[in-house]
């Protein structure tokens, strides 16, 4: 099968992945299947955290889940930028005081909700 290639921009890469995934796994939302696969990939990351390909499997599945819920590559990239800006604007506890085995979550108050 002839799959599309992608250029250097992230939107084109998401679109190429989307086309391949549609041809390979079909057009349905596949939510339960994607979540099941994500859980398995997270186990693989935990077993081998220094393998970047395992981390990328998680990224690809998350992107697959997003476009299968109806979001375009442009919307996905815009959401990524918006979330990054939102996280940068939040207050965070000092990482040195955090348990390294627990998530570091932003400080929650009415202004950050």
Residue ranges of each PLM-predicted region?
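Flexible "arm" and connector segments at domain edges
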Residues: 1-113
